[in-house]
Amino acid sequence: VSNIVWGNQNLSEFLKLLKQECCDGIELAPSLIWKEPILSSSEERSSLKKKILSSGLKLVGFHSLLFSRPDLQLFKSEISRKNTITYLKDLIKLCSELGGSQLIFGSPNNRLLHGKKYEECLKQSYDDFLNLAEYCFEKKVFFCIEPLGKNLSEFIVSMSEGGELVRKVNHPNFRLHLDTKTVFTTKEDMSFIVDKYGDLIQHVHISDDDLNEPGSINKEHVNISKFLKKIEYK
C-alpha cells in the first residue's frame, strides 16, 4: 500500500492501520516523507527504517520518484539528463539503505520528449537505463519502468513498448512494472502481454481511475489476477 493515500501526516498511525489490515509492506513516495529525500540525514533514514520494521512491515520500495522535481527532465538537455540520472541514483541508494527492493519509474512529466523524435529518445534511454540498472545491481535493488497511457505520457505508453525496452536494455536489474489502470487505458490484451513479457514483470500496482477503489470503475481486476497467477507473481 502506498503512503500517497495518507500523505505525510501521522505515518506511525498509518503503519499501524496497515498491519491491522494484514498488509505485509508499504511502498513510499519519498517526497511525502521528506521535502528533499536525498538530503535526509543518516539519523532520519535509520529512524524511518526502524519505524517501518517495528510496525511489522517491510519497505517494498519507492514510486513517484520525481514528483517534487519537475526540473529534472530525461530528454530535455544533456545537463538535465545527467542531473536526472544522478538524482535517481541518489534515490536508489536511499531505497537500498531503507531496505527497499525496487523503484518504480513512472514520473510522466519528467520523461517528456521536448520536441525530439521518439526513436532518438528511445535510443538515448538504453544507455541511461543500463547505467541505472548497473548501479541497482550494486545496491541490490531493481529499477522498473512503468508504462503509462498516451493520456499521461509521451514515452513508453504501452506494456508492449515497456517490454521491448526492458529486453533491449537486457540487464537483470532493469525490469517491467504493470499498473492495472494503464492496462485498462491502453486496452492491451493481457493474455498477449503475459505470454510475451510475463517473465519481465517485477512489480504490480492494483489501481483504478482517479485513485478510486480497485474494481469500482473497471471490472477486469479479477481477470488480471488470473493472468498474474499464471506467471506465479507474488
Specify the residue positions occupied by each region the protein language model found.
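Well-ordered, non-membrane alpha-helical segments in soluble/globular domains
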Residues: 45, 125, 221-224
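Gly/Pro-rich active-site loop or hairpin
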Residues: 8, 15, 37-39, 74-79, ...
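Hydrophobic pocket-lining residues that define ligand/cofactor binding sites across diverse proteins
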Residues: 18, 95, 136, 228-231
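Hydrophobic faces of well-ordered beta-strands that scaffold small-molecule active sites
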Residues: 1-3, 24-28, 59-64, 103-105, ...
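N-terminal pre-domain/capping segments
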Residues: 1-100, 171, 187
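Active-site acidic/histidine proton-transfer and metal-coordination neighborhood
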Residues: 12-13, 53-54, 71-176, 185
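Active-site-proximal loop/turn and secondary-structure-junction residues that shape catalytic pockets
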Residues: 5-7, 30-32, 65-68, 109-111, ...
